[in-house]
């Protein structure tokens, strides 16, 4: 019997569902799919769906990776809308990626294809510590303070 998976949808814990839905729709460009008042909502942009749950599931400060077509253009758009950019678009081996923070401290890592021929930049970890790429792989503490 085949029990194939159909996909995965991250559930992000939020403190105020109404404010979070407004943020995801107005600032990040998601559409509201459905909402159970004051409890749970589904938002979608393109092929990315996220569930938002008020206080009951998970922990604040979740991380989600979202593939996008153009991280640089999206960065400019989100910055113009006043969205908190935790870390600007930076090249890594897996993607050209930025970190965006929602109203509740959840981090959305949004990335497009890596830039060929460009070295990997520094990384901002979950504690706000900067890391630099280590030759041969991994990360070392340190980096610029800016």
What are these regions (language model features)?
Residues 1-21, 62-64, 112-146:
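N-terminal beta-strand motif that seeds the catalytic metal site of vicinal oxygen chelate
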Residues 2-5, 11-50, 56:
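Core segments of cupin and vicinal oxygen chelate
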Residues 7-15, 44, 55-81, 96-101, ...:
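Vicinal oxygen chelate
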Residues 40, 93, 113-117:
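A short acidic/small-residue loop/turn micro-motif
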Residues 50-52, 100, 110:
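Generic preference for hydrophobic
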């Amino acid at each position: 019997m085949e029990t194939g998976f159909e996909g995965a949808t991250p559930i992000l814990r939020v403190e105020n569902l109404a404010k979070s839905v407004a943020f995801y729709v107005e600032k990040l460009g998601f559409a509201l799919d459905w909402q159970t008042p004051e409890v749970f909502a589904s938002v979608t942009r393109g092929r990315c769906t996220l569930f938002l749950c008020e206080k009951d599931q998970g922990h604040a400060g979740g991380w989600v990776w979202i593939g996008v077509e153009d991280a640089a253009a999206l960065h400019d758009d989100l910055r113009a809308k006043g969205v908190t950019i935790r870390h600007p678009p930076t090249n890594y081996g897996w993607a050209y990626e930025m970190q965006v923070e929602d109203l509740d401290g959840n981090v959305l890592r949004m990335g497009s294809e890596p830039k060929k021929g460009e070295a990997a930049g520094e990384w901002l970890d979950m504690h706000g510590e900067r890391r630099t790429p280590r030759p041969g792989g991994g990360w070392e503490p340190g980096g610029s303070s800016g």
